[in-house]
Amino acid sequence: MASQGTKRSYEQMETGGERQNATEIRASVGRMIGGIGRFYIQMCTELKLSDYEGRLIQNSITIERMVLSAFDERRNKYLEEHPSAGKDPKKTGGPIYRRIDGKWIRELILYDKEEIRRIWRQANNGEDTTAGLTHMMIWHSNLNDATYQRTRALVRTGMDPRMCSLMQGSTLPRRSGAAGAAVKGVGTVVMELIRMIKRGINDRNFWRGENGRRTRIAYERMCNILKGKFQTAAQRAMMDQVRESRNPGNAEIEDLIFLARSALILRGSVAHKSCLPACVYGLAVASGHDFEREGYSLVGIDPFRLLQNSQVFSLIRPNENPAHKSQLVWMACHSAAFEDLRVSSFIRGKRVVPRGQLSTRGVQIASNENMETMDSSTLELRSRYWAIRTRSGGNTNQQRASAGQISVQPTFSVQRNLPFERATVMAAFTGNTEGRTSDMRTEIIRIMESARPEDVSFQGRGVFELSDEKATSPIVPSFDMSNEGSYFFGDNAEEYDN
């Protein structure tokens, strides 16, 4: 995807590259994906996993978490300085599931972090590639976004649970770099900033001294990341105010919450990438696919292609519905937790239901769950069509708000008009327009009030047949617009607790 000015495409962020042309980007992303695949194959060999066990998504997640933990410099250093009982700072591990005599057995494994780092480097031609690590972090983040709700976290920071669609990437670790920043929703960055400001209010020394200077730099950098997600001049000007504040406090928190609310209509630019579990890349590499030579893109047809012919399994608890488990993982694979369900259903070719109606819990299995009753089934991750992932948020044009879909942050660049009750959103903006940001607040409210619900997002963009890899003939779906298509309505999901 061509990007303007100094913006790098996601792929460049993800591979840490400078500006490259499309072919170079595809090759460097391919190199990253191939590295993950080779690492996964090697780990399966080390752990003596059968082909079936290697395709089990729970095993994939354990292996991914092990390598992420092995490279977590900060935490490793902390663990060495603060030894805790029964935790070896040099080792990492997790549950590996094996199929023995027709039953699933859980085995807890422990590995030297140094050994894991060696295997990772070897798989990546001797380099310490962080790009592949970030890629796995984003896959875990997308899985969390589809699985858990963040209502509690929202309420704790003084935000409203209805802003859940702004929370993409809220569980990404701090060390996820530029690629991580690109996929964070407006609400996620607002929440990080509010937490920071609250600490500053409670702790006199937070902004002081040498440490305080670093804190201040981090604060301003986060403000700039958030500013870059907004697409109207008034929102950006308000971010400048927040960033330049001498001593950030409640006024800034108010401004940030106001901005987060405004993002429900004036949506921010949030990137979406299809990050798949490591076992999928492993399978492809094992079957002789050369990612670097073929090239790969996280935002085009490639991930759809890969899922079309990968068979991945998952453990299923006694009263879970395998089709629902498949939907959960499909959404995670395409970063579609915040997409309109009608768009997702059309692309998937199967009805995608709201989370409140899913009979499935998360993918990971807690250590105290009974393995006796566990079964496994194939995840159905195929799709009927494919579509390009977006980073724009789907406003019809930059300066005018299109009436954004409440509780939806589009993933796919597919035309849809936006059903929404402006009244419900505007109700959130009664009251405070005084203070130093009053003119900007007034301007933002004016833009939102002039937003027309009949505006169409992604005009003329459509989905493509899986045989149409060059995206030549878009099929523009028509949606029944009578019902709002949010995944989160009637929600009863578990909270995300670390």
UniProtKB/Swiss-Prot annotation:
GO terms for cellular component: helical viral capsid; host cell; host cell nucleus; ribonucleoprotein complex; viral nucleocapsid. The keyword RNA-binding applies. GO terms for biological process: symbiont entry into host cell; viral penetration into host nucleus. Signal peptide: none annotated. A motif (Unconventional nuclear localization signal) lies at residues 1-18. It holds the Pfam family Flu_NP. Late in virus-infected cells, may be cleaved from a 56-kDa protein to a 53-kDa protein by a cellular caspase. This cleavage might be a marker for the onset of apoptosis in infected cells or have a specific function in virus host interaction. The keyword Isomerase does not apply. GO terms for molecular function: RNA binding; structural molecule activity. It comes from the Viruses. Keywords: Capsid protein, Helical capsid protein, Host nucleus, Host-virus interaction, Ribonucleoprotein, RNA-binding, Viral nucleoprotein, Viral penetration into host nucleus, Virion, Virus entry into host cell. It is found in: Virion; Host nucleus. A motif (Bipartite nuclear localization signal) lies at residues 198-216. Its main location: virion. Residues 1-21 are annotated as: Disordered. HAMAP family: INFV_NCAP. Belongs to the influenza viruses nucleoprotein family. Encapsidates the negative strand viral RNA, protecting it from nucleases. The encapsidated genomic RNA is termed the ribonucleoprotein (RNP) and serves as template for transcription and replication. The RNP needs to be localized in the host nucleus to start an infectious cycle, but is too large to diffuse through the nuclear pore complex. NP comprises at least 2 nuclear localization signals that are responsible for the active RNP import into the nucleus through cellular importin alpha/beta pathway. Homomultimerizes to form the nucleocapsid. May bind host exportin-1/XPO1. Binds to viral genomic RNA. Protein-RNA contacts are mediated by a combination of electrostatic interactions between positively charged residues and the phosphate backbone and planar interactions between aromatic side chains and bases. This is Nucleoprotein. It comes from Influenza A virus (strain A/Swine/Iowa/15/1930 H1N1).
